[in-house]
Amino acid sequence: MIEPTSVKAPRILVIRGGAIGDFILTLPVLAALRERFPGVEIEVLGYPRIASLALSGGLAKAVHAIESPGLAMFFARGGSFDLEWREFFGQFAIVISYLFDPDKIFETNVKSCGPCQFIAAQHRPDEAKPIHASDVFLKPLEQLTIFDGDPVARLELPGLGKRKNWLALHPGSGSESKNWPEQNWRELVAHLLDHSPLNLLLIGGEAEGDRLQRLANGMLSDRLEIAQHIPLPELAPRLAKCAGYVGHDTGMTHLAAALGLPTLVLWGPSNETVWRPLGEKVRVLNQHSELAKLTLETVVEGINALELEQF
């Protein structure tokens, strides 16, 4: 479905699929466009459950669903395009696409609809090069004379009060190789409840399965809450009120860092130079693909070093 927007102001469309982390790492693009073109309406074509974060943070005027059936023919040669989508693409002064489109089929089809300028951006960094993902995603904006975009993803949500005395923990990921062992997490939860005044918010989605319930089993229920399967637009403000965050190499960790939380990342086998969350309050514990060897003591020291805001 195409969301209605103003037809008066010039419009820029940023097309971004991918998972939560991919989108968060593209927020600097939206911020740079907004700063460079303050009178332009910036819109996103992506997955609304993720891209709606840009609406909440004031980085986009509208979000349109990339999974719309009417878009399917734009990925085929010689397709018969939906009239509504032809008119939609033709209304933009600039279209910036981060889709994987090696044969330029999508690019060719969108160009035929009449946007003034189409910029084909790299959909994923080359991990053989020591360049952070956000810098890779900002690079195409040089075609718009934007050379100084801030690579730090920042998401400011309006109307939030002081941060509560809560520490958010995300003990899972989409890959077991990225996870600190579950038993270690259980020991960490017990330690924090016994030796700190912090309340704990365990967050997760489908990837965590029953892990959160297992970690909470037998713990002090009045100081521990589980937030699982909560839509991002609802989870983000709840997360933003926490004093800090501990998690793995995940999209949720990128979200916490973008929200400005003191963030401790238990890093696994991924390329840290390319994929780590950026920010003044981010600390990374990297065991160089041997995450299981990361000790409880080291993690507790890392949490203490975050200088959490407590009330």
Where on the chain are the PLM-derived regions?
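Catalytic machinery of carbohydrate-active enzymes
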Residues: 1-311
